[in-house]
Every structure is written in C-alpha cells, then in structure tokens.
Amino acid sequence: MEAGEHELVVEIPYNSKVNIEAMFLLGEFSVKVVGRDQVLDAVSHKAAFSDLTAQGYPFYGGNMTYKIPFISNGGEVNVRANLFRAPVIKAAVDGKEAGYIAFSPYEVSLGELSKGEHLLELTVFGNRVNTFGTLHNCDQKEDWYGPNAWRTTGDLWAYEYQVKPSGLL
C-alpha cells in the first residue's frame, strides 16, 4: 500500500439486536489514536517501559517481547516487574526460560549467571481488552465485562476510544 489516504468499506446487515465483532487489519504498521481518529504509520519494532497503547499498539492483543541486554557481576540474579498491565510475563535469559511473573512479589529468579553480557527477554502476554473490550465505555471504574457493558449511554458513552494501559509500565 502506498502512503496516503485509503478507505476500507465493509457492508453487513446491522440493527439494534446485532453486534459488530472486531475486524483485524494485519500488517507491519503502528496505529496512532487521537480521540476518534486513527492513523496508520511505520512500525518501530522498539517499545519503551511505558503504555504500549501510546506507542503504536492501541488495539494490539498479542504478546510483546522486550529484549534487554545487561551485564551481570555473576551469581544469583532475579528480575522484578511490579508495574505492568498484562495477565502474565514470561522471563528468559540467554534463550533459556526462567519462569513467569504474575503474582506478588512479581519476581522470578534467572538463576546463577556468569559474569558478563546476557540477554533478558520479558514476554508480556497480551489480552483482548483493547481488541474486544468496551472501547467506548467512559466508566473508568467498570471492572465487569458482560453483555450490557458494551451498551452504554449518556455520559458513560464516548465516540473517542477509551483504551486501557498495557505492557510494562
């Protein structure tokens, strides 16, 4: 696809008793969401320790792996991730799985490491909250997802996307 404005038209029968399911546009691109508008852009293949929804992945529901080179002094090494929005994080060092981070104290042992350079890989497992979730529900305290959570009205509804933070924050 060339850079510029494009229009994708999908026609389906729709009424108040039918819901539209999420549709996926797959490819090597990022998405910037500002209010109601979305713009596709080049993907960076890099992510900071910050909300992934603001880094080009507002609707992404898959896994994301952070690759972090580090130098060890040798000996027992632990990794802790106490500020994240994901179901679970898988930790690996130098290609060897070390364990999972999901519950307090949000820490996993990488084992005894030799002195020198190593590669830590933290795979943050995705979820579908920003793909299938209540993206127009303005109730920030809503923690239940069921049939009527998608049917908001009045001040609880917004045309602008209400994405939830994700990733290593």
Segments the model singles out, each with a brief description of its role:
Residues 8, 70-94, 101, 120-122:
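Aromatic-lined ligand-binding clefts that engage carbohydrates, nucleic acids, or primary amines
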Residues 13-42, 125-169:
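Glycine/proline-rich low-complexity spacer/linker segments in large multi-domain proteins
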Residues 66-68, 104-108:
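Short strand-edge motifs at loop-to-beta-strand transitions and within beta-strands
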Residues 113, 122-123:
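Ligand-binding pocket scaffold of soluble enzyme catalytic domains
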